[in-house]
């Protein structure tokens, strides 16, 4: 588990520190640097997978993220031509420091120093106990990609959730790794039963029909609904609410997680109604309380409030939840973001509310009164 990361001279972060917990929520106005922390971790992983991190350097473009070249990666107002990531893992006594030299037109920043050693495979950022779901996830589709390698060897749903349906089809009957994630209304402890139960809190009575079709090199998805003692006909995803298909990989990734896993999820609540957004906050909190580390980017006050309620109800300890708010002083001569650390107490209360931090409802309410 990652306990701490410091980022120097990368994009809008000149020198920013993030003490992480089990559940980490990144917020802020658009363009303030929320994604920069996520990108730093993805850069390390894609460089590790391409075997450049130990001996060559930081690969800026790859399977996880595409930054461009050195001029796109280096902070505009950096006084040093270097990018440094310092990561403290719970599994290691000392922080690991990654130093890279600047090259203006190269997409591989030369390695100056790397703390990667033989134990790196045990770290969730570098092994198969990792899941990343980007904001640009797939919407409703009847047919999805197959990949035995991704779902069995990597245990990956794909960055866009493109293998989620295949994953469900293959693992539908497997029991959850974390029993606390079992929904109280689930008919069993299996993955599919619990995906259906949690998502029925978003759309009542939902049934998921995921079938692998290797003869067509695809996996099919359709939905049906409980209607009294009967079940409706199957419906194409295109004819059911957009949010269901968009959130399906998110729910699947959380319910299939095990203790020690690292999940990075962008906008897990998008396209859901407010109650569904709050539910996603609760689901993340349950996973975090059982040893899963989640790094989440969100603009949703409902998602935040779902986490706050979970803290108050003792679903997750307040100390295991970290909130980061990124902002930038438009009057400053330096184009760089600063990080603020609103704290959630045991009652779910937040100790500070910076301007722009989930405060739009209060502003609109003031105008209405």
Which residues does each PLM region occupy?
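Phosphate-coordinating catalytic segments in nucleotide- and nucleic-acid-processing enzymes
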Residues: 47-249, 253, 258, 340-369
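Switch/communication elements of ASCE P-loop NTPase nucleotide-binding domains
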Residues: 1-56, 61, 70, 217-369
């Amino acid at each position: 588990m990652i306990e701490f990361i410091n980022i120097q001279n990368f994009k809008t972060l000149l020198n920013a520190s993030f003490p992480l917990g089990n559940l980490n929520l990144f917020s802020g106005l658009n363009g303030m640097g929320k994604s920069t922390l996520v990108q730093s971790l993805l850069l390390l992983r894609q460089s590790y997978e391409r075997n450049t991190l130990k001996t060559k350097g930081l690969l800026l473009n790859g399977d996880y993220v595409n930054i461009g070249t050195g001029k796109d990666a280096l902070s505009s107002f950096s006084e040093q031509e270097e990018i440094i990531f310092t990561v403290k893992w719970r599994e290691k006594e000392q922080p690991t420091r990654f130093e890279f030299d600047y090259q203006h037109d190269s997409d591989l920043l030369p390695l100056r120093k790397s703390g990667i050693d033989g134990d790196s495979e045990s770290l969730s950022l570098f092994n198969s106990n990792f899941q990343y779901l980007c904001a640009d996830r797939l919407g409703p589709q009847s047919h999805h990609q197959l990949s035995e390698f991704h779902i069995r060897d990597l245990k990956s749903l794909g960055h866009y959730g493109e293998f989620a349906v295949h994953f469900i089809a293959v693992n539908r009957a497997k029991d959850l790794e974390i029993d606390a994630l079992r929904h109280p209304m689930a008919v069993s402890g299996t993955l599919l039963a619990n995906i259906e139960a949690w998502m029925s809190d978003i759309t009542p009575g939902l049934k998921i029909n995921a079938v692998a079709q290797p003869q067509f090199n695809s996996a099919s998805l359709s939905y049906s609904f409980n209607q009294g003692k009967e079940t409706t006909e199957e419906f194409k995803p295109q004819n059911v609410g957009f949010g269901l298909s968009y959130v399906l990989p998110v729910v699947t990734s959380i319910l299939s997680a095990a203790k020690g896993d690292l999940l990075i999820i962008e906008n897990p609540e998008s396209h859901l109604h407010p109650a569904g957004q709050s539910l996603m906050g609760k689901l993340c909190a349950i996973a975090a309380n059982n040893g899963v580390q989640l790094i989440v980017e969100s603009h949703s006050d409902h998602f935040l409030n779902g986490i706050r309620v979970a803290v108050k109800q003792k679903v997750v300890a307040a100390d295991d939840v970290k909130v980061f708010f990124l902002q930038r002083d438009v009057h400053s001569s330096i184009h760089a973001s600063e990080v603020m650390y609103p704290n959630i107490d045991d009652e779910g209360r937040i100790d500070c509310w910076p301007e722009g931090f989930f405060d739009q409802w209060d502003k609109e309410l003031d105008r209405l009164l």
